Amino acid sequence: MKLTKFVFFFVTIFSGSLCAAEIQGNVIRVLDGDTIEVKTLPAKIVVYEVPIRVRLINIDAPEKKQPFGRWSTSQLKTLVAGKQVTVSYSHKDRYGRIIGHVFTTNGTDASRFMVQSGAAWVYERYNVDESLPALQREAQEQKRGLWADANPVPPWEWRYKHN
């Protein structure tokens, strides 16, 4: 009986993190350097489809009005706009956006691409990918993208000052 209670408790507590979902679709809009809209691929059952808003996990890109904001958006557009992607996720944020790993058909992880090219920061507060800080350091050392700026301001600081 105690074992049954323990198993039930374990499954209840950790089920949210164990249940991952996946969607496939075409990117119909790139809103900024870390947010896209995906239209899911047609299913066998016809349903009313709405675009699904997805925020790339582990990163924070410059805001549109921030230095490098438009450039960051264009980097993500080059990678995924109009293309098929697979999104793997386990939760949504407070705005209802899926927070997920976005992969192109050739396997490129959009979050890693954005950090490696200097188009986004590792979002240290929420990052769970231990390899991303090294990619960011490499981008900084090579002065790629936003790291070409002498004093780039992280988006979370920029939002605090401008909102």
Each predicted region: which residue ranges?
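Small beta-barrel nucleic-acid-binding modules, primarily SNase/OB-fold domains
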Residues: 2-8, 17-163
